Amino acid sequence: MKSLFKKKLCLASLSAVIFALSACGAKTTGPAPEVAIDLGRSSLYTPEELNIAVLLIKDKFVTFAGCELHSIRYAGDDANNEKNLEWLNSLREVRSNIPPEDVGKQYVQVAEFLSNFHSPVEDGDYAWNQDMEYTDYQWWLGRLDDGRWEIVSWGY
């Protein structure tokens, strides 16, 4: 009988600890908000090609601790020009994390995206101003001749 009581007491204590730990610092925010995507119109890229670029941006954005992404939009075909292509290729030349098989390759196309997001409400060790809406945050992607996109630069 004592053994059964001890098991129940231990189980109840463990449940209370788990509940308490799960509530510590936890915030019930509900489901993640929808991110509005605007691919606009492009005579250079298909919607599928632009969506692949958007997925790369979303994957990178996940590293923006505490930030909430609201929207991403394609900035238009005008960004794909010689000046921007030279700029992105110059940035690629100084990168140290290029796979050996891609060393020496150049971007053949450029795409710019703009995003809106909100920085963390809580004060923390973040690179962002607290509780602020960031608008038209730039994402610059270069495209290699095999069709792969790479995020080259982001920010203002």
PLM regions: where:
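Short beta-strand edge/turn micro-motifs at domain boundaries
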Residues: 134-156
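Functionally constrained cores in energy, signaling, and assembly domains
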Residues: 8, 15, 115, 138, ...
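Sec-dependent N-terminal signal peptides of Gram-positive bacterial secreted proteins and lipoproteins
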Residues: 3-27
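Flexible low-complexity loop/turn motifs enriched in small/helix-breaking residues
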Residues: 24-124, 131-133
